[in-house]
Amino acid sequence: MTSEAAQRVAPPEYQARGEQAVIKTEKLKLETKWDKTYAKSDKVNHQKVTFVNRYGITLAADMFTPKNYTGKLPAIAVCGAFGAVKEQHSGLYAQTMAERGFLTIAFDPSFTGESGGQPRYMTSPDINTEDFSAAVDFLSVQPNVDPEKIGIIGICGWGGLGINAAAMDTRIKASAIMTMYDMSKVTANGYFDYEKDEATLKRERMENRKKLNAQRTADYKNGTYALEGGVPDNLPDEAPDFVKQYYDYYKTGRGYHPRSLNSNHGRNLTSQLTFMNMPQLSYADEIETPVLLVHGEKAHSRYFSEYAFEKMTGVNPHGQSMTVGNKELVIVPGAIHCDLYDGGGKNAIPFDKLEKFFSANLH
């Protein structure tokens, strides 16, 4: 045996013990009553489920199953938006797709909602991408799921994470990305980075790094973590229109939920550092499976989907609906960003298109 080969063999004491990493679940406190921001459907069965990710964090999910189904079902895992919980729009998507014949789960990310993980309110491009793959783990072993027919829906900031997961996890056979944010891009460059030159972007990134690392020191000294991203209770008149749109969803009866980070005090501030340093779309151009991007025509965030589509196809859509190979961009006329959370009172979510997409590609 060569010295190089010997280095690849575990020491005898480890071989003898056959040591393995054992998967253990946390005990979670799960709400038993219906506490969603959307009405309960009588067309599906609902139950709470839990599963564990590769980092040992137990995730909580709502599972929806069509009533009176037979055989194994195609399945879809849903998450988002970034800072939202499953009782908000991801659950609405999951329940609606279950009405249309899919077994679905809407899950809370690590450190969020009813899911486990300490400290609370953390975000991570790695761990949150892993959350999607953990959902696929769970769905793959369900007796009523065909493991070769699993897809995902990522909403808002979980759209970028969904693309990251699809680039990594070949078990994901189709991905729908709704009203997408690329959290790495917006964290590193701020909003509307296409309006800035590279020198400005570099200078702003360095200034932000210095502030965030100073915050790390302060957090450690204080023994607490500063939070950011929650929609304020009192919105200033000069707030941007898209922030007012977030307020209209997260802070009103339309979408408020007591466990939602966006509806309350937000998420860990210094987590921005890892998002700045780890681009989510690095291998988007290597995704071989079908991807459907859906965005509102009037959404401030539309450029994220256009950028992702160009990254995957090499074609700039210039704000138009377009199909290149098995990648499709659908622009919803007149819709703003949050209209694709719950329909915005105008049925903006193209559920017929989603049903057609997943029916065609989870076959």
Task: State each model region's role.
Residues 287, 293-295:
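Short beta-strand/loop motif that positions the catalytic acidic residue
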Residues 335-347:
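Catalytic histidine-centered segment of alpha/beta-hydrolase-like enzymes
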Residues 96-116:
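Conserved alpha/beta-hydrolase
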Residues 23-71:
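N-terminal cap/lid segment of alpha/beta-hydrolase-fold proteins
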Residues 82-95, 109:
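The serine-hydrolase catalytic nucleophile loop
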Residues 164-251:
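Alpha/beta-hydrolase-fold enzymes
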Residues 72-81:
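Short beta-strand element of the alpha/beta-hydrolase
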Residues 86, 112-147, 344-350:
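Catalytic nucleophile-loop/oxyanion-hole region of alpha/beta-hydrolase
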